[in-house]
Amino acid sequence: MDALLQLKGIDKAFPGVKALSGAALNVYPGRVMALVGENGAGKSTMMKVLTGIYTRDAGSLLWLGKETTFNGPKSSQEAGIGIIHQELNLIPQLTIAENIFLGREFVNRFGKIDWKKMYAEADHLLAKLNLRFKSDKLVGELSIGDQQMVEIAKVLSFESKVIIMDEPTDALTDTETDSLFRVIRELKSQGRGIVYISHRMKEIFEICDDVTVFRDGQFIAEREVATLTEDSLIEMMVGRKLEDQYPHLDNAPGEIRLKVDNLCGPGVNDVSFVLRKGEILGISGLMGAGRTELMKVLYGAMPRTSGYVTLDGHEVVTRSPQDGLANGIVYISEDRKRDGLVLGMSVKENMSLTALDYFSRAGGSLKHKDEQQAVGDFIRLFNVKTPSMEQAIGLLSGGNQQKVAIARGLMTRPKVLILDEPTRGVDVGAKKEIYQLINQFKADGLSIILVSSEMPEVLGMSDRIIVMHEGHLSGEFTREQATQEVLMAAAVGKLNRVNQE
């Protein structure tokens, strides 16, 4: 089968860094090509070379069989290559049609926008994707999943033959993911080629036909997905076997550190649980069940309307995140780019931001040497891959950004560490490193709450698991009792609380 798009021998270097070396990618009509690799493997750089954002240093790009060079995203877009970024590129205050044809509005012979034609064309594109809403609806009124469908419709408006999807399900519910997969199958049937960039193994094996593996900027292999197992694919990605994906540390938890009684707040109703020293408490549940809301009420980022929280036997009241930090409760957000990190600031500034009191003199000036020493220690402990602590954190991979976010929380010397989706958007190798760090904190007696949508992660790392459903606690299980089936039954409200101390 002839490829729609073929990149061969692609090299790209930046000062001091060889980002791509002999990289290759083929995209075939009517097939989904997964592009996988650890964070920093070169996937994003390859997409920027492909779409003309970066100029390649060496190699060839064949588009529809002809040697081609794109001089920017507009050039590749007009040629028929569409890209849907992880962060959606839509304006909430405009309608669907206005977003789809922004800058390309239909104009009548009097020089005015032909609204009737524009909405008709947009409705036609939505119908191609079997979507039930009309194009006169505001984008801001749509769910994230439906907004993603608008991005696909926008790509189709350019008559794109190849569509690149970057972590497309990162913010989607299971139902929205199913809808996306139906659309991808429809696009395949129309002969379009899809590039599917994802860390989620389950999705790759469900929706992709072929897979291309990158490692350290190099092309490793192209295989049919049907010929692989998850283990063999991961081994190609990381260059080694991951013997134990979830390295659980089996030690006896200590005395009760945190006690929550009848806690209520926005999206949280009458929740009670305990957390012991040196224990990992997993929090499971479906999207919208109230897991993140519970953590934010506990930490002080959302108001508590009733209930009691005691820490080491003393009642604590957290009316703000500052109160949470002052009492030894640290919350690492599920959205590190929005809530957790200042992307334009350096690794050092991000890591020490909430711990500046520890590096301040009486007069308010900073002890810069102490700050640098502490940041350097954490960079080594966490194996953060960065040229220097002065590097802008926005330039690091997702896994390294997450390590910095966790390190920042630990700099305040907390008693309770809340990790909300700690490995979201993180590759398999970096995940393993984060799990090992979590075990290290656990061994040191830190009390950890692990909130995750990935059931294998919760099952693999937790000592106990509580499940939430519609703001309530719907189940509590020991490690031995917990299975995916039991957790799912509790998550949909079909199982009563069965655990017991």
From Swiss-Prot:
Residues binding ATP, per UniProt: G37, E38, N39, G40, A41, G42, K43, S44
Record-listed E.C. numbers: 7.5.2.7
Residue ranges of domain ABC transporter in the record: 5-241, 252-495
Gene3D superfamilies: P-loop containing nucleotide triphosphate hydrolases
Bilayer disposition of the protein: Peripheral membrane protein
Example of a GO MF term: ATP binding
Any single Pfam family the record assigns to this protein: ABC_tran
GO cellular component: plasma membrane
Enzyme's top EC category: translocase
Matching CDD domains: ABC_Carb_Monos_I, ABC_Carb_Monos_II
PROSITE patterns named in the record: ABC_TRANSPORTER_1, ABC_TRANSPORTER_2, RBSA
Keywords: ATP-binding, Cell inner membrane, Cell membrane, Membrane, Nucleotide-binding, Repeat, Sugar transport, Translocase, Transport
Recorded catalytic activity of this chain's protein: D-ribose(out) + ATP + H2O = D-ribose(in) + ADP + phosphate + H(+)
Signal peptide residue numbers: none
Main location: membrane
Protein localization: Cell inner membrane
Functional note: Part of the ABC transporter complex RbsABC involved in ribose import. Responsible for energy coupling to the transport system.
Assembly with partners or alone: The complex is composed of an ATP-binding protein (RbsA), two transmembrane proteins (RbsC) and a solute-binding protein (RbsB).
Family statement: Belongs to the ABC transporter superfamily. Ribose importer (TC 3.A.1.2.1) family.
Name the UniProt record assigns to this protein: Ribose import ATP-binding protein RbsA
Organism listed in the record: Salmonella typhimurium (strain LT2 / SGSC1412 / ATCC 700720)
